[in-house]
Amino acid sequence: MSMSKLARKGSTRRAAALATAAAFLLFAAAPALAHSFLVDANPSSKDHVDAMPKTIKLKFGAGVEPAYSTLSIESGDGKVLAKGAVGKPETPRELTLDAPGDLAPGRYVVRYRVLSQDGHIVEGNYEFFLDAKK
């Protein structure tokens, strides 16, 4: 076998090894994309609502562990008005929190800290507004 054929064979093997390594890294990273990021909420971010909903409902992109997760509603000045989290086995990607009634119009913040079923903690917050009754 000539030297050029050996060199081509070696470069083909290197290319195959690099392609295999790239595929492995691509598929190994997939579980990291499964963290429980917020995908829907009621009320949602920047919503203006005429009445406070009875329940705050958050939906995540992957399952969460309710026993190790917390939701809270805060007033615009940072006072915690309600805290907790309720999850149901039939809807593992959703958490709810009973909202306090009789709140004054203004800005409210929903904070969440959830434990994903993949073991990662995801935290975030958003605001919504309770408008004055007309």
Model features per residue range: what roles?
Residues 91-97:
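Aromatic sugar-binding surface patches on proteins
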Residues 99, 104-110:
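A glycine-anchored, Pro-Gly-centered beta-turn/N-cap motif
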Residues 34-52:
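N-terminal edge beta-strand
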Residues 29-31:
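N-terminal signal peptide c-region/cleavage motif recognized by signal peptidases
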